[in-house]
Design a protein with these regions (language model features):
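Short, conserved catalytic or adaptor-binding loops enriched in Gly and charged residues
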Residues: 26-27, 68-69, 116-119, 200-207, ...
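C-terminal alpha-helical cap of glycosyltransferases
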Residues: 318-342
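Active-site and donor-binding regions of nucleotide-sugar-utilizing enzymes
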Residues: 1-137
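Catalytic binding pocket for nucleotide-activated donors in carbohydrate/polymer assembly enzymes
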Residues: 121, 235-313
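Donor nucleotide-activated moiety binding/catalytic core segment of transferases
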Residues: 38-46, 196-238
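Redox-cofactor binding/interface segments in oxidoreductases and associated redox assembly factors
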Residues: 55-56, 77, 101, 154, ...
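Conserved catalytic-core segment of nucleotide-activated headgroup transferases in glycan assembly
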Residues: 1-13, 130-201, 280, 284-287, ...
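Short acidic-hydrophobic, aromatic-tinged amphipathic segments that line or gate anion-handling sites
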Residues: 33-39, 211-215, 277-286
Length: 342
């Protein structure tokens, strides 16, 4: 999106709470990045915005600390993952004026919540998924390995339902014994919230030459190397599936949806339903036989077809998300200015 504004020579103010945001490295002329601090410092700044159109990846507008500014004409939220739009905390998207989607399927549940809660209808526009567009280009440029060894990528979510925190050694010990290359890529939040657990596991496998821990910012190098992924319900499953088109093994667990918008839908989420169709379920009682499970996890025609359907459903307008987002923002600003007679 920033590249698109720069290409069109249109000025954009870009606020970030990441002091080392990659945007600062781009040397843009028209895009002006600014670090606004973290936590309350950032919220104070955001609550005093003055702009025609504000685009955010942060949910929860007008729910907790993040408030609408009277000097902003239009608040838009852009989804940054191709999974369900209702997996935010309660009322996560209720008070935005528009939501930019990765796939048309996300409209149905948002419209259901609007009707059920009797709230103002939002503009729901399918633009695509900008970060997947970028990763797709990057992953193409990574050369194939000359002497590739079979590689398993363990890439979980964080918290009590994440496979690392819940199962840890029970899963990793049998994997280590296979002799295959094992890449463990913890969720970024785990480094902050589950450091003790990670330190324990890293110490346990420090002498295993076939186990590598990946904390790099970009996940594409591990995704490219992996022949199969083991995860839970982490969103990275869809990154791997859509970018690499390879089989996925998932460890299912109960997820308490009560704190999330999804709970009010009263039905199974698209991402859970889809994972059952395109993934291979792994039960805890099969951990000891994980080598056999992986060997038998043949990439059937049916699984391949389900991955294709999922990609077509959740990642629309491939390669055009940045352009579509900028088009929307410019057109929205122009229409708002026209209404005010400017």
């Amino acid at each position: 999106m920033c590249d698109e504004f720069e290409k069109r020579q249109i000025e954009l103010t870009y606020y970030t709470s990441a002091e080392k945001d990659p945007c600062f490295e781009q040397n843009y002329k028209y895009v002006k990045p600014e670090f606004i601090g973290e936590g309350n410092m950032a919220f104070v700044r955001l609550n005093m915005l003055s702009a025609g159109v504000v685009l955010m990846t942060t949910p929860g507008l007008q729910v907790y600390q993040l408030k609408r500014s009277k000097n902003v004409k239009h608040y838009s939220h852009v989804l940054h993952m191709p999974n369900d739009a209702t997996t935010y905390r309660l009322f996560g998207l209720d008070y935005f004026d528009s939501v930019l989607l990765t796939g048309d399927y996300q409209k149905t549940d948002l419209q259901y919540l609007e009707n059920a809660r009797n709230i103002t209808k939002k503009e729901l526009v399918t633009v695509g998924c900008s970060y997947l567009d970028i990763l797709a280009e990057k992953i193409k440029s990574i050369p194939e390995e000359d002497n590739h060894n079979f590689t398993v990528l363990v890439s979980p979510s964080w918290g009590s339902v994440g496979v690392l925190s819940k199962y840890g050694e029970k899963l990793l010990d049998p994997l280590a014994k296979t002799g295959w290359n094992i890449i463990i890529r913890p969720h970024p939040q785990s480094k902050k919230s589950e450091k003790e657990m990670l330190d324990r596991l890293e110490a346990r496998y420090k002498d295993n030459a076939n186990i590598v821990w990946d904390y790099e910012r970009d996940n594409i190098y591990s995704l490219k190397k992996a022949d199969i992924m083991i995860s839970d319900f982490s969103g990275i499953i869809f990154d791997y599936t859509f970018l690499c088109d390879k089989p996925v093994i998932y460890v299912a667990d109960y997820i308490d949806l009560r704190p999330y918008d999804a709970y009010d839908l009263g039905k199974e989420l698209w991402q859970f339903e889809t994972l059952k169709k395109m993934g291979i379920k792994l039960d805890e009682n099969n951990f000891e036989n994980i080598a056999e499970v992986i060997k038998n996890a043949s990439d059937s025609k049916e699984l391949s077809e389900q991955r294709k359907i999922a990609k077509e459903t959740a990642w629309m307008n491939i390669g055009n998300a940045g352009k579509n987002i900028v088009d929307f923002m410019i057109q929205k600003e122009e229409s708002l200015s026209k209404k005010e007679g400017k």
